[in-house]
Amino acid sequence: MKSASCSLTPTWRICVLTDHFDIVVVGGGIHGVGVAQAAACAGYSVLLLEQSALAAGTSSRSSKLIHGGLRYLEGFDVGLVHESLTERAILLKIAPELVRLKPFFIPVYPETSRRPLTLRAGLSLYAILGGLKRESRFRELARSECRALDGLRPDNLQAVFQYYDAQTNDADLTHAVMHSAIEFGAELRCPAEFLSADIGASGCEVSYREGVTDRSCTSSAVVNAAGPWVNTVSERISPLPARMPVDLVQGTHLVLDEGLDAGCYYMEAPQDQRAIFLLPWGKQSMLGTTENLYSGEPAAVTPLAQEVDYLLEVLQHYFPHRSQQVIDSFAGLRVLPAADSAAFKRTRETQLPVDNPRLPRLLAIVGGKLTGYRATAAKVVHTLRRSLPDRRSRADTATLPLKPVT
């Protein structure tokens, strides 16, 4: 897994000393940098504070998919899927070097709980929500085509469906969005620890530590985009916001030594019917993910032995002759609304609580998907507009090209 960094080029270290910003963003994951870009493109002055490195947390430890979320249709999250498919189409257009369309294969066996009729219905709705574009079409493979599917177990194979979604390098995408934000005037302090924020009716006072130096600034609004640290950041804000009832859900991925030729695989875990992906990752492949509640320090999350065993059991079930040599593994944390139900069945809708709906000075991003970062950022800026000065928009993030940072 590529490590994150705050200093890809010398320009990343250039910081204009400014005492006041329209928006201060806390957190340098994909949602934080997305807000920085959206705000800067809307003409606002922005400061982003990141405690360690860009994409150091969840934004470098995801499944690295830009997708509509086919399985969310089972929970009737049609709005979320439609938005995600819209965002997928936008990212394929504005970031072709970062986001690439890939074929996905869904195998069906007698023990598969999602039967062919159900899959056809779901994929049909998926195609409709995607606008019936080329990247939204699906088909059932002929029996002869299944022999070329990277050693997929042929015995009792009843059907294989092919559809399309997209893949990215999440850390690279995060860096590209931040670079775009900087080009439109956003400022980055990294590493910089957020210390406190005093939220008042007329604005905010923010303190942070950069190296050994404590600094402060004022802003019209503060955005808490700290991901798994969202409540930790909230505890440093005055007046103290209500603690957000969330669960941290650990997801582990394995990087395997053997690559894939045909594409990506969407498999149903025989143990619990959860969705598991086997994805090409350079010359290797990536297998994931798990979902287990996590209660420790977010920075200390690490793959568990039982998670490795669980994933390799899935691999063995579908690909009995593939190598199971693990050359790397990583774990990340998703932020989900607290609930008694299994993490797999919970909504992925992003929540944007504010301190004052009439004149918001503080907004938190709770949850969120990699695919929807741009749409979420647009909602954040729209929500905060009534608390911000009038500015002239400079660019539209829906059409602004994104390039890899070299």
Predicted segments, located by residue:
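Flavin (primarily FAD) binding-site architecture
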Residues: N224-P239
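Glycine-rich FAD pyrophosphate-binding loop
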Residues: A40-R61
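Beta1/beta-strand and adjacent pyrophosphate-binding region of the FAD-binding site
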Residues: L17-H31
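A conserved short coil-to-beta-strand element within the FAD-binding core of flavoproteins
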Residues: C190-C204
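Dinucleotide-binding Rossmann-like beta1-alpha1 core, especially the glycine-rich loop
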Residues: K64-A148
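Helix-loop-beta segment of a Rossmann-like dinucleotide-binding subdomain
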Residues: P107, R147-F184, E205, T290-A299, ...
